[in-house]
C-alpha cells in the first residue's frame, strides 16, 4: 500500500483528491516511489515535485480554507463590509447587493427591481397570474412555494412559531412578529393625517380610508359600500337573515357578535332581578 513519508504530502494528497490532474500526478509518484525502493535510495523527490505544483489559486475575496472533513477543505468567501462568510462566490455576490443597494433584475411590466433573479421570477407571477404550487388537500394554488407551505398548515394544524411570553402559537413567523407587539406595545405604523398609530400595516390601510372616504367593498344586494371586507360580510347577513350569534340564556340570536354582547349584559340583569 502506498504511504506518505510526511504530513505535508498527506495534506497535499487530500487537496488533490478532487482534482482531475490527481491521477496523472499519483501515477508518476508511484513510479518514483517504486524506483527509490528498488535502488535503496533514501532520498525521495516527490515532495519537491508536489511543492512545485500550484495547488490553489486564492481570489482576493477568499478567506481561509476551512476543513469540513479529513482531507477535504472548503473555500470561504467573506464579505468585506460586514464579515459574513459564504461557501459560494455567487452567494457572496448576491449578499453584497444588500450593502450596495444594487438591484439589477427589473420587471418589464411595472419597473420594480430585485437583487436576485429568482425574486423577479416570483414577482412576475403577480402579472401573469401563474400559480404553479397547488395544495394536494384542497386544490388551492399559490405563486410561491413558501405560501403553499404556510397554507398546508391549515390542514395539518401545525403551528411551529410560539410566543415566548404567552405560548400562543402561529402558522407563520410574520403572524408571530405581529402578535409580539401586543406584549411590547409597539405600533410602528402611523397615520400621516392624524398621527394615530397601529401595530399592523393592514390596520393603518383600513384607517386611512376614514380620511379618504374610500369604501372598496360593496354589497351585492343593495350596493352599500364599506371600508372593510369584514363589515361588508357582516352587513350581508341582513339580507340573508343569518343570525349566527345565539344568547345562551334566552335563545335570542343576532347577526353581529357585538349586538349579542350588548344583549347579554341586559339579559343577565333581567335574570338577576
UniProtKB/Swiss-Prot annotation:
Keyword Repeat: yes
Keywords attached to this entry: DNA-binding, Metal-binding, Nucleus, Repeat, Transcription, Transcription regulation, Zinc, Zinc-finger
SMART domains (alphabetical): ZnF_C2H2
GO MF terms, alphabetically ordered: DNA-binding transcription factor activity, RNA polymerase II-specific; RNA polymerase II cis-regulatory region sequence-specific DNA binding; sequence-specific double-stranded DNA binding; zinc ion binding
Highest taxon of the lineage: Eukaryota
Zinc finger (C2H2-type): 77-99, 105-127, 133-155, 161-183, 189-211, 217-239
One BP term from GO: regulation of transcription by RNA polymerase II
Subcellular location: Nucleus
Residue positions binding Zn(2+) 1: 79, 82, 95, 99
Segments forming CCHC-type zinc fingers: 245-267
Matching InterPro entries: Znf_C2H2_sf (IPR036236), Znf_C2H2_type (IPR013087)
Annotated residues for binding of Zn(2+) 4: 198, 201, 214, 218
Binding site for Zn(2+) 5: 247, 250, 263, 267
Principal cellular location given in the protein's record: nucleus
Cellular component terms per the entry's GO annotation: nucleus
Positions of Zn(2+) 2 binding: 107, 110, 123, 127
Keyword Nucleus: yes
Family, per entry: Belongs to the krueppel C2H2-type zinc-finger protein family.
Known function: May be involved in transcriptional regulation.
Protein name (database record): Zinc finger protein 32
Source species: Homo sapiens (Human)
Lineage of the species this protein comes from: Eukaryota, Metazoa, Chordata, Craniata, Vertebrata
Amino acid at each position: 500500500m502506498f504511504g506518505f513519508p510526511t504530513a505535508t504530502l498527506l495534506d497535499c494528497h487530500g487537496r488533490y483528491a478532487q482534482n482531475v490532474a490527481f491521477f496523472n500526478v499519483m501515477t508518476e509518484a508511484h513510479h518514483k516511489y517504486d524506483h527509490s525502493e528498488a535502488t535503496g535510495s533514501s532520498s525521495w523527490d516527490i515532495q519537491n515535485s508536489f511543492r512545485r505544483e500550484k495547488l490553489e489559486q486564492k481570489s482576493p475575496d477568499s478567506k481561509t480554507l476551512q476543513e469540513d472533513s479529513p482531507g477535504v477543505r472548503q473555500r470561504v468567501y467573506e464579505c468585506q463590509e460586514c464579515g459574513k462568510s459564504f461557501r459560494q462566490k455567487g452567494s457572496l455576490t448576491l449578499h453584497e447587493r444588500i450593502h450596495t443597494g444594487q438591484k439589477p433584475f427589473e420587471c418589464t411590466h411595472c419597473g420594480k427591481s430585485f437583487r436576485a433573479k429568482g425574486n423577479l421570477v416570483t414577482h412576475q407571477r403577480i402579472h401573469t397570474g401563474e400559480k404553479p404550487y397547488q395544495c394536494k388537500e384542497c386544490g388551492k394554488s399559490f405563486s410561491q412555494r413558501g405560501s403553499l407551505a404556510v397554507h398546508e398548515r391549515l390542514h395539518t394544524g401545525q403551528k411551529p412559531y410560539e410566543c415566548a411570553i404567552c405560548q400562543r402559537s402561529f402558522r407563520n413567523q410574520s403572524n408571530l412578529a405581529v402578535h409580539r407587539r401586543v406584549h411590547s406595545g409597539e405600533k410602528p405604523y402611523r397615520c400621516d393625517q392624524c398621527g394615530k398609530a397601529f401595530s399592523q400595516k393592514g390596520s393603518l390601510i383600513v384607517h386611512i380610508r376614514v380620511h379618504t372616504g374610500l369604501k372598496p367593498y360593496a354589497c351585492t344586494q343593495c350596493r352599500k359600500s364599506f371600508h372593510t371586507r369584514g363589515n361588508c360580510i357582516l352587513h350581508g347577513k341582513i339580507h340573508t337573515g343569518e343570525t349566527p350569534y345565539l344568547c345562551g340564556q334566552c335563545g335570542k340570536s343576532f347577526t353581529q357578535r357585538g349586538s349579542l354582547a350588548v344583549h347579554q349584559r341586559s339579559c343577565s340583569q333581567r335574570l338577576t332581578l
